[in-house]
């Protein structure tokens, strides 16, 4: 090679260049990112991979790629957006999961704009760990950001349920979907009994 660097080995017939978690090829001085490296073939995915490589080369940080929280959006009308596991994937990996939903037709901003098609759907474990989220509707790609952040940082569903969201915005849909996780507890027979018991002291 002209650069005096040993080339990376790519098996014949392989559709992409094989890399490790740090995006290094079989020659550890050569990195591969973007479509040639396989994985999610999105512009934002290539940008994420570039950041991993820069941290490894320039700052000598052992940065590793993790595509578990890589968002994807289909720019149709309405938009389709997803991050993390689907319901089917989650049920295969976990014994029990909860499905949280909230429709845009319950959102005041969507009503005001007369664009109420769509909903937010989230998949969580019984203890509130977020596994994935899907959104269909106007600006679905933009609304996916908090779910992507939660998955990336390992935040539980309570983090999204407790965040203060400006009114009226479509962002409230995600907050309400997250809050749906607590509905069985808030409206359970036990909770009603506690409320009745406490109200007795106010008489």
Predicted regions span which residues?
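FAD-site-proximal beta/loop scaffold in flavoenzymes
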Residues: 1-59, 161
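A short alpha-helix-loop-beta-strand transition element characteristic
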Residues: 6-11, 60-71, 95-100
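Small-molecule pocket liners
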Residues: 15, 71-72, 120
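Short secondary-structure boundary/capping segments
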Residues: 21-23, 65, 112
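Short, flexible turn/loop "capping" segments at secondary-structure junctions
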Residues: 25, 29, 66-68, 126-127
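Short, flexible active-site loops
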Residues: 33-39, 67-76
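Internal hydrophobic alpha-helix adjacent to the cofactor/substrate pocket in enzyme cavities
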Residues: 44-67, 96, 151-157
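Flexible, glycine-rich terminal cap/loop adjacent to redox cofactors
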Residues: 75-86, 91-203
